[in-house]
Amino acid sequence: MDQVIAELAATVARKSEEGLTATPMPNVGLYKVSRCIDLLPETYRPVVSLILQGEKQLSIGDEILIYRAGHTFTAALDLPVLGKITEASASRPYLAISLAIAS
């Protein structure tokens, strides 16, 4: 599994720009963030995300969730969160693939 994640991470790093990059596949996006980012309030729409590299922390109410390479995040409904990228750099950016779920 680690090799599959590493291969996906290498592909996303090559194919994506900083931030969100759309793909030819509907509802599929590539994320690349090359620096740590402090807490940002967001509303996640229904989505499934696979973290490929780096680390992201989400605060949902009183819960703090940490996502690293190989972890998945699923939101089945609109979800207000505070998110921050806690592990990312220019040489080793935070990378993820997301699939928006039609509601």
Feature roles, as predicted:
Residues 1-18:
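Cyclic nucleotide-binding regulatory module and flanking cytosolic helices
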Residues 20-103:
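N-terminal regulatory/effector-sensing and dimerization cores
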